[in-house]
Amino acid sequence: MNTLNVKLSHSISQLYETLCQVGKSTFADLQRATNFKDTELCLALCSLMHDNKVYQARISNTVYYIIK
């Protein structure tokens, strides 16, 4: 596994743990909690959504990410 895949895998795990702790969160909330840059957070969120671990919901014009 190359370095990029290892880093992304670690980011995905860290993001999942963060979401489990804080519950539903906005993109900005997750950035503050993880200190991820936009691209890193997007890739980790996409991976978790692809694996059906997280879903995206619009509540009162705000997009939230929520553990399934």
Question: What are the residue ranges of the model-derived segments?
Answer:
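A short, conserved structural fragment
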Residues: 49-59
